[in-house]
Regions:
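Acidic, metal-coordinating catalytic cores used for nucleic-acid/nucleotide bond scission
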Residues: 96-108
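Conserved phosphate-donor/acceptor-positioning beta-strand/loop module used by diverse small-molecule
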Residues: 115-135
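Hydrophobic anchor at the beta1->P-loop junction of P-loop NTPases
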Residues: 32
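Conserved glycine(s) of the Walker
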Residues: 39
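Conserved substrate/cofactor phosphate-moiety recognition/catalytic segment
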Residues: 42-91
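N-terminal pre-Walker A segment at the start of P-loop NTPase domains
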Residues: 1-21
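Small-molecule kinase domains that catalyze NTP-dependent phosphoryl transfer to phosphate-bearing small molecules
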Residues: 141-220
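The conserved Walker
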Residues: 36
Length: 220
């Protein structure tokens, strides 16, 4: 159960959402599985626009919690509270947080059942050099830029370091190590029925694939 302060965070987030009417016959709860730097937030925004949905960002909620000196332990519950209201208002919901964890997927499945919605999982991958390049060249979002790290530098550089640390920490959830021929990471098989696996290395390619996927969702 959320505390009064956490409910205020959910209210604050929901108030700034631009609710749009869903473009699918049945409500959709869409979630992504992919490492930091794979493009989850960018692709999620594109998908939300194409299916008539709202984007719910776990990192944005964490920033609100941090500003109010609140712990992160109920981020999922806050996200779900916002999602239920968005679906009830006629929108689809797209989450940009990594859903590789079984517990998180079970919660998403339960949310979809309660809302009589379809839950859809999309896997994102990218060439490692492109992933690292995005992190180094881009501006980290406020959550990473404000996160704690012993690395002393300007906020932007600190944010990049934290995001790289997060990629390193989460890699075993997505890849397994093959020691043959000097060693390489191989994509791990997960017990998930994916609607699609999309390589975001090339922008035009993933944008085309997301548009095709959205068209499928709208027809279903």
């Amino acid at each position: 159960m959320l505390t009064a302060k956490e409910l205020n965070i959910a209210d604050e987030y929901f108030k700034v959402l631009k609710i749009v009417r869903r473009r699918t016959a049945r409500p959709v709860v869409a979630a992504f599985i992919g490492l930091a730097g794979s493009g989850k937030s960018t692709v999620a925004r594109r998908l939300a626009r194409e299916i008539g949905g709202v984007l719910i960002s776990g990192d944005a909620i964490r920033v609100l919690l941090r500003k109010n000196n609140l712990p992160y332990k109920n981020v999922r519950a806050i996200s779900e509270n916002i999602a239920r209201r968005a679906i009830a208002s006629g929108a689809n919901v797209v989450f940009d947080s990594d859903a590789a964890d079984l517990v998180k997927r079970k919660r998403l499945d339960a949310l979809a059942r309660q809302a009589q919605a379809r839950v859809l999982y999309i896997r994102l991958v990218a060439e490692p050099d492109v992933t690292f390049g995005r992190m180094i060249a881009g501006a980290p979002d406020p959550f990473f830029a404000g996160a704690s790290t012993p690395w002393r530098a300007a906020p932007r550089e600190r944010g990049v370091v934290v995001k790289l640390r997060e990629l390193w920490r989460r890699t075993p959830h997505h890849y397994q190590w093959n020691s043959k021929q000097g060693g390489r990471w191989e994509l791990k098989k997960l017990p998930v029925k994916f609607s699609a696996t999309i390589d975001t290395t090339d922008t035009k390619t993933w944008q085309r694939q997301i548009s095709q996927l959205a068209k499928r969702f709208r027809r279903a």
